[in-house]
């Protein structure tokens, strides 16, 4: 396994200083993707402000197959919004004042997307120290500090592999959302589409440290080549920050995706510690890994790794939530019965008053039962116990026990005539858990945002954002002042009690 350390190209990097703290730093909030918020959310009383996240959304009939990057939040309540500006490429970040949405600054990027089906998310990150990184062309990271200051700046520029990077602007692509560790080191996947530096090979993982020094390792398997690091799979870090987790595609084709692997790497050296095939627990065949999804590893408080895959053969289109020990050497429990395009959120068991099991934490997942995929169309959300099990009614498999489930509320006109009781899909790829109110905030394709009260197992608040649309799944987050942020139909909505 090759590993490279290079002196990276840096523009104005040494002069940058980190002076702001971070409330929401990236995909699913933190490097473990827990999606837990310590900030109490405001009531879902009104849409306080809204802003487009796509200036040229490309619809497929009545559907929108575009993933949007998560907003980021500073402690000073600056909301940093990734925005798609063109039909197929073109990206910028806009910083807005959380109180009223007023524009503070705009930073553009020359980034272009890797080859894709559904449009991938554009994933920036804030370090815990408040430094902002976002992807640029040729594998470049663009950098700025003082993110709460109402001024556009000339960003710093960091390249992880070579000084003459502009030669490879068109071919070297950052292919995952960025992830920051507790010290401010940045991790991401890359791929090379065309001529590029030989050392990079065709796909791998890169790290840029706080001094701008780059490390990268091409990913390979002894049993065969790796096709690419999985698009949209934000790298995750163990609780002690020493192990990095990411998934990658093998070359065996399955439907619209491929077989895949989950890697554990030393976070400092990027040495591969272990790599395991991702298998369908029912058939024993390679599970499908799809670049149209955004599933990323979630790290439990005990170090377990949870990762969602699609089923093979495709019996349900729900997939599975696989679980692994921290070193990936074993599976400490049964899978969850849903894994497609979902990053599980961590729920402290104390938030669920009706729970009397032994687990210290539970998992919140989307739990759709797709009518178009052989299910009954009764789409739900679920709280699951990773240490207990029950028989899955559809597959006969033993799966994580359902602690709570809740059915969506809006009938689905596409399916309700053939599937009585069918409701619109839940439209989340990561849902924020509000620790202060014992609730989960989740989007639905009916265009509404729901507060799921875990004490009463009911929807205690609902607010309509749009008329509803079929779309690629989106995140929910909570800002520094408690406003809830949700994306629906290419628009970011800030919801709260009012200004």
Region annotations inferred by a language model:
Residues 4-15:
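Bacterial N-terminal signal peptides
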Residues 18-20:
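Boundary at the C-terminal end of the N-terminal hydrophobic targeting segment
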């Amino acid at each position: 396994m090759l590993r490279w350390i290079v002196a990276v190209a840096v523009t104005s990097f040494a002069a940058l200083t980190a002076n702001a703290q971070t409330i929401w730093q990236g995909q699913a909030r933190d490097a473990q993707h827990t999606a837990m918020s310590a900030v109490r959310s405001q009531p879902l009383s009104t849409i306080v402000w809204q802003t487009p996240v796509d200036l040229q959304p490309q619809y497929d009939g009545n559907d929108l197959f575009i993933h949007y990057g998560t907003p980021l939040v500073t402690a000073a309540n600056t909301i940093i919004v990734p925005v798609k500006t063109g039909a197929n490429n073109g990206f910028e970040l806009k910083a807005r004042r959380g109180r009223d949405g007023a524009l503070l600054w705009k930073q553009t990027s020359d980034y272009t997307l890797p080859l894709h089906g559904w449009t991938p998310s554009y994933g920036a990150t804030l370090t815990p120290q408040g430094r902002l990184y976002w992807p640029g062309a040729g594998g470049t990271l663009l950098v700025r500090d003082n993110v709460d200051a109402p001024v556009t700046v000339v960003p710093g520029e960091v390249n992880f592999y070579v000084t003459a990077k502009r030669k490879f602007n068109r071919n070297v692509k950052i292919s995952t959302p960025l992830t920051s560790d507790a010290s401010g080191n940045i991790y991401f996947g890359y791929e090379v589409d065309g001529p590029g530096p030989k050392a990079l090979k065709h796909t791998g993982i890169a790290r840029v440290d706080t001094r701008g020094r780059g490390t990268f390792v091409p990913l390979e398997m002894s049993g065969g080549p790796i096709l690419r690091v999985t698009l949209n799979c934000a790298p995750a870090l163990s609780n002690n920050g020493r192990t990095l987790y990411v998934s990658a595609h093998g070359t065996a084709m399955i439907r619209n995706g491929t077989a895949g692997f989950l890697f554990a790497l030393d976070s400092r050296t990027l040495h591969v510690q272990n790599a395991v095939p991702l298998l369908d627990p029912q058939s024993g065949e390679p599970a499908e890994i799809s670049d149209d999804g955004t599933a990323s590893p979630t790290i439990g408080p005990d170090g377990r790794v949870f990762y969602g895959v699609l089923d093979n053969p495709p019996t349900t289109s729900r997939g599975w939530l696989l679980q692994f020990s921290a070193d990936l050497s074993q599976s400490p429990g049964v899978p969850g019965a849903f894994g497609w395009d979902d990053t599980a959120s961590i729920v402290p068991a104390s938030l669920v008053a009706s729970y009397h099991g032994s687990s210290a934490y539970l998992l919140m997942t989307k739990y759709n039962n797709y009518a178009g995929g052989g299910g009954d169309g009764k789409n739900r959300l679920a709280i699951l116990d990773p240490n207990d099990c029950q028989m899955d009614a559809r597959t006969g498999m033993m799966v994580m026990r359902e602690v709570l489930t809740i059915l969506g509320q809006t009938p689905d006109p596409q399916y309700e005539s053939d599937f009585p009781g069918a409701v619109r899909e839940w439209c989340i790829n990561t849902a924020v858990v509000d620790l202060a109110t014992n609730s989960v905030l989740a989007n639905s394709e009916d265009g509404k945002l729901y507060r799921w009260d875990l004490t009463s197992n009911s929807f205690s608040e609902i607010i309509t954002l749009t008329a509803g649309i079929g779309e690629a799944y989106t995140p929910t987050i909570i800002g520094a002042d408690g406003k809830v942020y949700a994306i629906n139909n290419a628009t970011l909505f800030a919801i709260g009690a009012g200004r």
